[in-house]
Amino acid sequence: MYKIYTSYFSNKKLPEDIQKIPICSKILSPGNYATYYKELAPNASDVRDLYNQNITEVEFSLNYLNKLEHIREDRSLDLIVQDLELRLEYSDIVLLCYEKPNKFCHRHILAQFLKKNYDFQIEEF
């Protein structure tokens, strides 16, 4: 079975054959993407508030985890998980956002959430 990774759009080390899937509210980087999981993006207001330092990283994380729980409860996250499982039959997957690996980013929260709730092993690429 193939693997799931997280990374950032401008990572030049990503292989050409990896399935690239954005998980942010806006895609500013042109590219050939396998699909787009906009549902996994944090709320735009939380991103703005974090950027403007109106909320802390802890508050952002709690808000994002609440969003993930909500989409898990309404079963839309199950559809994404099923799609990921199908895609893993063909090649590795990378879930993309903008922040560099050493910066705070929702993709790291998502990776932990998917590990805890769906037993996915996700690494930063």
Annotate the PLM regions.
Residues 1-125:
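Residues lining hydrophobic/aromatic ligand-binding pockets adjacent to catalytic sites
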